[in-house]
From Swiss-Prot:
Cited HAMAP family: UPF0260
InterPro entries, per the entry: Puta_zinc/iron-chelating_dom, UCP006173
Protein name as it appears in the record: UPF0260 protein Avi_1324
Domain of life (superkingdom): Bacteria
PANTHER family: UPF0260 PROTEIN YCGN
Entry similarity comment: Belongs to the UPF0260 family.
Biological source species: Allorhizobium ampelinum (strain ATCC BAA-846 / DSM 112012 / S4)
């Protein structure tokens, strides 16, 4: 008898810290700078990454201290998942919150942290660090691929 994986049986608010952190697939999309239109409230992604994002691994270079270094870094909690519309449709937190399963490329399913990159879901190779871009120039880096990577992966047959 095989038991179901924890993400299929627990709500986000029932997970312990280790389970919660493992839901992050390491795509790095959360770590892209976003711009919000003050009039419409629309949030758009840029390809400008947080200075702490490792462009190869798509993981934070200083995760334990990230909020001290980057004060506006969002520490995602179960209560926030529903309210953050910019979480990509491929996000493990979003999927579990919506009662959906994780995709084959998620490290919890594949057992390999590289599959998120192999599937083309991550930010690897698509970003520039904010250390090299003036805030005034962020608009030059607007992009929509963070919200469409899942569709692109599905269209290429990588479901």
């Amino acid at each position: 008898m095989t038991s179901e994986p924890y993400w299929k049986t627990k709500r986000l608010d029932e997970m312990n810290t280790v389970e919660w952190e493992a839901l992050c697939d390491g795509c790095g999309l959360c770590c892209l700078n976003k711009l919000e239109d003050w009039e419409s409230g629309e949030v758009v992604f840029t390809s400008v990454a947080c200075r702490l994002l490792d462009g190869e691994s798509c993981r934070c270079k200083d995760y334990p201290n990230r909020q001290a270094t980057v004060p506006d870094c969002i520490q995602l909690t179960p209560d926030q998942v529903e309210d953050i519309a910019w979480l990509p449709p491929s996000c493990g937190y979003r999927l579990v919150h919506e009662g959906r399963d994780l995709y084959w490329w998620h490290p919890l399913v594949s057992g390999d942290p590289e599959t998120v990159h192999q599937a083309g879901i991550s930010a690897r190779g698509r970003t520039v660090s904010e250390e090299h871009v003036s805030v005034e120039d962020f608009e030059d880096y607007l992009c929509d691929w963070p919200m469409t990577v899942l569709l692109q992966a599905e269209e290429s047959g990588d479901q």
